[in-house]
Structure formats: C-alpha cells, structure tokens
Swiss-Prot record:
Species for this entry: Shewanella woodyi (strain ATCC 51908 / MS32)
The keyword Cytoplasm is annotated on this UniProt entry: yes
Keyword terms, alphabetized: Chaperone, Cytoplasm, Disulfide bond, Redox-active center, Zinc
NCBIfam families: PRK00114.1 (NF001033)
PANTHER family xrefs: 33 KDA CHAPERONIN
Pfam families membership: HSP33
General function of this protein: Redox regulated molecular chaperone. Protects both thermally unfolding and oxidatively damaged proteins from irreversible aggregation. Plays an important role in the bacterial defense system toward oxidative stress.
InterPro entries for the chain: Heat_shock_Hsp33, Heat_shock_Hsp33_C, Heat_shock_Hsp33_N, Hsp33_helix_hairpin_bin_dom_sf
GO BP annotations, alphabetical order: protein refolding
An example Gene Ontology CC term for this record: cytoplasm
Name under which the protein is recorded: 33 kDa chaperonin
Length: 286
C-alpha cells in the first residue's frame, strides 16, 4: 500500500469536509536521527500527522511550525514544514518517560504555538495551552479559538506508522451542527489498525458507506530537511571571529550538527577564513 499521502474529501450532502493522512517513510525519517523512547516516537508521529492536516486545512503558501513547549520531562517537540507537505521534526526530553503518560504528564505546564509564515503577507501565530490530555484535544481547542469552526481531530502513532483524520464544518451560512455531529460520531469509530493497514478509499467506505463522499487526488507527504553547509556557514558568521578562532585553537575545527536529520558539518581554519572573507566555504568537508 502506498503510504505518506494526505487525502482531502467532501461530503456531497453536508457542508462538512475531511482530511485523512497516512505516514510511514517520512515518519521513520523523522525518528531515524535520534534514539527516541516510545512515548516520544508516538508523540512525534501524532504531531507529524497533525501538522500535515493543519497544513492542508489552513490553506497558505509558505512555512508552518507546530511547536509544543513545557516545563515537564519533555521540554520541546516541533514539526516544521511548508505548504508542499515537506516536513521535519525533533523533540527534546530528559529522564525516564512514562509509557502511558498523557500530554500533560509529558509536558507539565505548557503551550502549543502554531506559526504560519506565508511567502507573501504577514506572519501569523496562534497559542493554546496544553491543558487537554491529548494532542488532538488541544488542536480542537485551537480551532475553536481561531477558526471558530466545529472541528474534530483523530491522531494515531505506534513508532512505525502515523495517521490522522480531520473533520470540519465548511464556513457557510446556516446551522450545520447536527450533520457535523453525525459525521463526527461515524469518524470516531475508526481504529488505528484501519488507518495503518487499509487504503484511504477503504477507510472512508467503512466509515461513511451510507454517505456520498467525494475524494480528491492524494498529496504526497515527505521528510525534507532544510539544513545545508551554506546555512551552517551563515550561522558561524554571526559569531565573533575571536570566539570562532578560540574554538579552532582548542578543537582544531568547528563542528555543527543538524538536530533534524543528524547531518554533521565540519569547518577547519581554511573554511573559517573563507567564511569571514565572505567567500563560499569549500564543499569538500561535510
């Protein structure tokens, strides 16, 4: 079965739309950079699926960041991406994590920040407290505050696969609560195994076989890291030459690693001289 796709669909006889995302390869690439424990693997999987759903829902051209921060064992979990469904993510934690801990146990007192940076127009940022036991619940609260449209979100992850569904009332006139609640009840019956193992068409048929559903062409979701040797060189340029020379004297080279993909960039004294003379550092060392 083809994985790593986002599927959009509409109900022909109700002013409600939906999305379904199934992830495997992109999820594994996010996890491969670090030896995450199971609770973090599941958290990042759900967050990856959620960011894909949000990217399609919020309809923008540019970059998106969904970041969870807290004072608990997990201090940070973030997925960054763009409207092309190119995503990357990382988490930071300390100590032992409870295998059955909910979102509040993982993050303690925390919040979620959703940032949209369009290629044109103003940057938008929304913040919601992590005061629900699940990520899906916090995202539903975000939509209640920002979009003010009834929205239902379902998220699953197991360390190998991640998946999610989003249901939302279309912004049209009239009261659509009854039809939304009916479809929400049907959607709530979906099982993780169905989303992990079945094609999207089969999942939708099982859930909504008495409804008329229009399914659009899938959009591929990929892992894509934006790190590069040039970006690392630019970061070095922001540090004082004196400090950089001090590190070189002590360590012989400057090592810079990407948290997202674990790629390491190495710069020696010749590279550093080129950086500070505003010429491109040689491409031979990485």
């Amino acid at each position: 079965m083809s994985k790593d796709n986002l599927h959009r669909y509409l109900f022909e006889n109700a002013d409600v739309r939906g999305e379904l995302v199934q992830l495997e390869q992109s999820y594994q690439e996010v996890l491969s950079a670090h030896n995450y424990p199971a609770p973090i693997q599941n958290l990042l999987g759900q967050l990856l699926a959620a960011t894909s759903l949000l990217t399609a829902t919020l309809k923008f051209n540019g970059d998106i960041s969904v970041q969870l921060q807290g004072d608990g064992p997990v201090s940070l979990a973030v997925i960054n991406g763009n409207n092309l469904q190119q995503l990357r993510g990382v988490a930071r934690f300390k100590g032992e994590l409870s295998s059955d801990g909910d979102l509040q146990q993982l993050f303690g007192k925390g919040h979620m920040v959703i940032t949209l940076t369009p290629t044109e127009g103003e940057r938008y940022q929304g913040v919601v407290a992590l005061d629900k036991p699940t990520l899906a619940g916090c995202l539903e609260e975000y939509f209640a505050q920002s979009e003010q449209l009834p929205t239902s979100i379902t998220l699953f992850a197991n360390g190998k696969q991640a998946a999610g569904m989003l249901l939302q009332v279309l912004p049209t006139e009239g009261d659509h609560n009854a039809e939304f609640e009916h479809l929400e009840q049907l959607t709530a019956t979906v099982k993780a195994e169905e989303l992990f193992e079945l094609e999207a068409e089969e999942v939708l048929h099982r859930l909504y076989h008495q409804e008329e559903v229009r399914l659009f062409e899938p959009v591929a979701v990929t892992f894509s890291c934006t790190c590069s040797r040039e970006r690392s060189a630019s970061a070095i340029r922001t540090v004082s030459r004196e400090e950089i020379e001090s590190i070189l004297a002590e360590q012989g080279k400057i090592e810079m690693g990407c948290e997202y993909c674990n790629t390491n960039y190495s710069f020696d004294s010749i590279d550093v001289a080129a950086i500070f003379s505003n010429t491109q550092a040689p491409e031979t060392k990485q």
